[in-house]
């Protein structure tokens, strides 16, 4: 898979000091992967030209991390990956927590998978001049606090990390992309050949069938101390660097998410040559949104 060359540059700049405090519900840590992509400071919510986007509204949390690939792998669309990620997050929020709602939902609430399908259709309709099936794509994580439950829907390699009231931490991650990538490295089909195909891996692109492919479930809210939606750039310490397991990552983000983000960037800067030699992006977008 081609990699956006902006993602292979020097270390990202500092983006504000550690606050020494946990995130409040709905708060976000977001740090773009490269100096060529303007970053967002700790307090602001202004748009970020990185691939990750996130939002929180009325108990619903959504994070989308667009694939930072070169334009030749998304030839059907004139829009950048960050446009797609932002549009997708907004569309999911509009499906589940519309800003023009006049009161509580009457009847059965829409299922998360149905909301994702509606959001994919809505984003496609926003750029009819493009071939959305050959356009950008993203990972997607959605949670909703509904009644006594925390519902979730997870697709591709962004994560939902839940810290329970007993202190245990669980990471929910769709591992199909990594399984396909492992087969590709062993001589099998490439991820681009197997994306959104039966037996392959799935992403949020334009195919509404992806809505039926997310990992779904729920937890009693009474058992949940905190939950975070996280891009794979934020969970690199678990999957790539092996410096943390899910338990240690959850404890770190609960204590000081900015310190965790700075630690990731410092680790990457120290190992830049080795990461390049391995064909790995030196940096990836960090996005962590607290859902509950």
Where are these regions (language model features)?
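N-terminal entry segment of metal-dependent catalytic domains or homologous docking segments
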Residues: 1-92, 214-218, 233
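C-terminal catalytic subdomain
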Residues: 4, 191-292
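A short catalytic or substrate-binding loop motif that flags glycine-/basic-rich loops and adjacent residues
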Residues: 34-39, 132-137, 280-283
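Catalytic core of PPM/PP2C metal-dependent serine/threonine phosphatase domains
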Residues: 42, 102-164, 194-220, 291
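Short hydrophobic beta-strand that contains or immediately precedes a catalytic carboxylate
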Residues: 61-64, 153-155, 228-231
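Short helix/loop capping segments that flank catalytic or ligand/cofactor-binding pockets
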Residues: 71-72, 162-164, 237-239
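Helix-loop-helix
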Residues: 86-120, 247-270
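Glycine-rich phosphate-binding loop plus the immediately following alpha-helix
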Residues: 169-204
